[in-house]
Amino acid sequence: MLAKRIIPCLDVKDGQVVKGVQFRNHEIIGDIVPLAQRYAEEGADELVFYDITASSDGRVVDKSWVARVAEVIDIPFCVAGGIKTAEDAAKILEFGADKVSINSPALANPELITELADKFGVQCIVVGIDSYFDKETGKYQVYQFTGDEERTKATKWETKDWVQEVQKRGAGEIVLNMMNQDGVRNGYDLEQLNMVREVCHVPLIASGGAGEMVHFADAYNKTNVDGALAASVFHKQIINIGELKDYLAEQDVEVRR
């Protein structure tokens, strides 16, 4: 059995790590490189960095901090933010990232997924999906430009359909960002994860809702996700990654030590 991954998520805005609640009201957490270093030392399996306003600002993620992160950590990391071309992706990978993740640019140009997968290999192409449960319709809808509160909008895609579409186009991994749960620390949306898992045949990473160690165990044991991504519980030192791995091992979850 493959070990389950613990993945701290660092949202980057104006050169600093920030965290919001349900993708709004972001507060500054701290500097990028020291936080990355801390998580690597605590035992994180990999890191994910989202430049949350790059797409809505029409720019590519700032590559200077990508190089600095690569110098100080020895675990894989993934970078997202305004990657619209193969050239954009190549530069980020050259600066030291192991994977690139695309979200809003993939919605704007789905062919980009195939282009990147063909050029760099599916193993380093991640598609992030921001999924919102609309209580009025009872459906999970994909949203775009979620890093900018004023530009956030629903797309034509229902989550399950988009998950299937991105796989056809070459996504090597999917990060499911569950917007309703983001930052509220009440647990992952297990129902949604199981729905997506049914049609997802590449590694699936749960994102949004972790507040206690049991939430990670539930995600792994009840939905069979490959990794769990979290931010505020790590940023605010509510959960220590080493202690989390000890706990998960006791819950019969295979983790890297």
Swiss-Prot record:
Reactions mediated catalytically = 5-[(5-phospho-1-deoxy-D-ribulos-1-ylimino)methylamino]-1-(5-phospho-beta-D-ribosyl)imidazole-4-carboxamide + L-glutamine = D-erythro-1-(imidazol-4-yl)glycerol 3-phosphate + 5-amino-1-(5-phospho-beta-D-ribosyl)imidazole-4-carboxamide + L-glutamate + H(+)
Which NCBIfam families has this protein been placed in? hisF
Protein name as catalogued: Imidazole glycerol phosphate synthase subunit HisF
What's in the keyword line of the UniProt record? Amino-acid biosynthesis, Cytoplasm, Histidine biosynthesis, Lyase
Could you tell me where this protein is found in the cell? Cytoplasm
Q: In which pathway does it act?
A: Amino-acid biosynthesis; L-histidine biosynthesis; L-histidine from 5-phospho-alpha-D-ribose 1-diphosphate: step 5/9
Record-level GO cellular component terms? cytoplasm
Main localization, broad class: cytoplasm
Q: How is the subunit organization of this protein annotated in UniProt?
A: Heterodimer of HisH and HisF.
Q: Name one GO molecular function term.
A: imidazoleglycerol-phosphate synthase activity
Q: Which GO biological-process labels does this protein carry?
A: L-histidine biosynthetic process
Role played = IGPS catalyzes the conversion of PRFAR and glutamine to IGP, AICAR and glutamate. The HisF subunit catalyzes the cyclization activity that produces IGP and AICAR from PRFAR using the ammonia provided by the HisH subunit.
Family the UniProt entry places it in: Belongs to the HisA/HisF family.
Entry annotation: catalytic residues: D11, D130
Q: EC number(s) on record?
A: 4.3.2.10
Top-tier EC class: lyase
